[in-house]
Regions:
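Active-site/substrate-binding loop(s) of hydrolase catalytic cores
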Residues: 2-4, 12-117
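Conserved phosphate/anionic-ligand binding catalytic regions in large, soluble enzymes, centered on
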Residues: 8
Length: 117
């Protein structure tokens, strides 16, 4: 079972939710042996730690969504990590404009966060 959170920096509730789920699995494993003994769990609370931290530094950064990778244009840093996967990359729902919130990146898997996952 794969569970992740924090792929978009501004979605602060998802890392907390993933952490809560992990706590419940650990503390109540006897109540659900079918989940804890018969499945392998892979849990990553924050996929985009740099973006997440940046969104929490100052109020003006609160709605930051992307990673923090420099793209050569000041103010347009980052890539939407959820648009940088190898599956259906550049297949709609994303942008090739590095200033867009849905910027897919210069190439598939360009973000270190995606390659590590």
């Amino acid at each position: 079972m794969w569970i992740d959170g924090g792929i978009h920096a501004r979605e602060w509730i998802s890392p907390a939710t993933v952490t809560w789920m992990l706590k419940e699995l650990v503390e109540n494993d006897a109540a659900h042996p079918d989940l804890t003994e018969k499945m392998d769990w892979y849990i990553l609370p924050i996929v985009n730690p740099d973006g997440y931290a940046y969104s929490r530094i100052e109020d003006r950064n609160r709605m930051w969504r992307k990673t923090r990778t420099p793209n050569g244009i000041h103010g347009c840093e980052g890539t939407d990590a959820n648009r940088n996967w190898g599956f259906h990359w550049n297949d709609g729902g994303s942008s090739s404009n590095s200033c867009s919130e849905t910027y897919m990146g210069p190439e598939v898997w360009s973000e270190v966060e995606n390659t590590y996952v």
